Amino acid sequence: LLGRCKVKSNRFNGPCLTDTHCSTVCRGEGYKGGDCHGLRRRCMCLC
Protein backbone atom coordinates (compact mmCIF):
# COMPACT_ATOMS: atom_id res chain seq x y z
CA LEU A 1 0.00 0.00 0.00
CA LEU A 2 1.94 2.94 -1.31
CA GLY A 3 1.51 6.37 0.16
CA ARG A 4 0.61 5.21 3.65
CA CYS A 5 2.18 7.26 6.40
CA LYS A 6 3.69 5.16 9.20
CA VAL A 7 5.53 6.31 12.31
CA LYS A 8 7.13 4.29 15.11
CA SER A 9 4.97 4.12 18.23
CA ASN A 10 6.27 6.16 21.17
CA ARG A 11 4.50 4.12 23.85
CA PHE A 12 4.94 0.54 22.62
CA ASN A 13 7.74 -1.32 24.42
CA GLY A 14 9.44 -4.56 23.41
CA PRO A 15 8.93 -6.71 20.32
CA CYS A 16 5.61 -6.35 18.53
CA LEU A 17 3.94 -9.77 18.65
CA THR A 18 0.34 -9.00 17.68
CA ASP A 19 -1.06 -6.41 15.31
CA THR A 20 -4.11 -6.07 17.58
CA HIS A 21 -2.09 -4.89 20.59
CA CYS A 22 -0.01 -2.55 18.43
CA SER A 23 -3.16 -1.07 16.88
CA THR A 24 -4.69 -0.48 20.33
CA VAL A 25 -1.56 1.31 21.56
CA CYS A 26 -1.43 3.43 18.40
CA ARG A 27 -5.09 4.45 18.73
CA GLY A 28 -4.28 5.52 22.30
CA GLU A 29 -1.60 7.79 20.81
CA GLY A 30 -4.17 9.37 18.48
CA TYR A 31 -3.36 7.42 15.30
CA LYS A 32 -5.76 5.47 13.06
CA GLY A 33 -4.26 2.11 14.03
CA GLY A 34 -1.04 0.20 13.56
CA ASP A 35 0.71 -3.09 12.88
CA CYS A 36 3.93 -4.99 13.53
CA HIS A 37 6.53 -4.33 10.87
CA GLY A 38 10.00 -5.46 9.79
CA LEU A 39 12.55 -7.95 11.07
CA ARG A 40 12.81 -6.17 14.42
CA ARG A 41 9.01 -6.39 14.85
CA ARG A 42 8.42 -2.73 15.64
CA CYS A 43 4.98 -1.30 16.23
CA MET A 44 4.29 1.17 13.42
CA CYS A 45 1.30 3.50 13.67
CA LEU A 46 -0.79 4.62 10.70
CA CYS A 47 -1.02 8.40 10.29
Curated annotation (Swiss-Prot):
GO terms for biological process: defense response to bacterium; defense response to fungus; killing of cells of another organism. Gene3D superfamilies: Knottin, scorpion toxin-like. Disulfide bonds join 5-47, 16-36, 22-43, 26-45. It comes from the Eukaryota. It holds the Pfam family Gamma-thionin. Keywords: Antibiotic, Antimicrobial, Disulfide bond, Fungicide, Plant defense. The keyword Disulfide bond applies. Belongs to the DEFL family. Fabatins have antibacterial activity against Gram-positive and Gram-negative bacteria. High activity against P.aeruginosa. No activity against S.cerevisiae and C.albicans. This is Defensin-like protein 2. It comes from Vicia faba (Broad bean).
